[in-house]
């Protein structure tokens, strides 16, 4: 499901930005921000996967003759950046700002990501500058403008299920130990 979410983000940008802002449909890709990705115009990087902790704890349920365990709810955090090193038409600062504005409009208008049969809330992350610097430093890159998005809750299905024996009928026989009287 995680890869499906990432591919859907990528497809949304391609559908909205090509051909007006992208040279070709391969201009948006899932990749880490690095100088060697010169064919990428816009990069989408999943930088964090964490537990979605806002919901109440869910327990296994019985479905027929098996116990089904609940999915794990996760939060996916993305960094979306305009590649300053893009080959064949790298962006000047003005073009870069226009592209960021277009992407902000796309994600603001979208607000919910349709992935398979799920509607997943999509929101911008208001991140402190120190946190942004930390992310970029961990990638060995200087800080640059980027959009930070969160998709949550994303259900990751449990592979665990157990066979249960369900008691459907009980025969109860009792014998009285008292003889006579009360």
Question: Can you say where each PLM-predicted feature lies in the sequence?
Answer:
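Short intrinsically disordered coil segments
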Residues: 59-64, 94-95, 161-173
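A short, solvent-exposed, low-complexity linear motif enriched for acidic/polar residues
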Residues: 8, 12, 16, 152-154, ...
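Short, charged, low-complexity patches
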Residues: 2, 6, 71, 92-100
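"Short basic amphipathic alpha-helical interaction patches in structured regions
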Residues: 58-63, 90-101, 118-119
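Oligomerization/assembly interface segments of phage tail-like spikes and tubes
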Residues: 70-85, 101, 143-153
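Small/polar-rich, solvent-exposed N-terminal microdomains that initiate assembly or binding
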Residues: 1-60
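Short, cationic low-complexity segments
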Residues: 67-71, 105, 165-182
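Acidic-leaning, charged glycine-interspersed low-complexity segments
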Residues: 98, 104-156
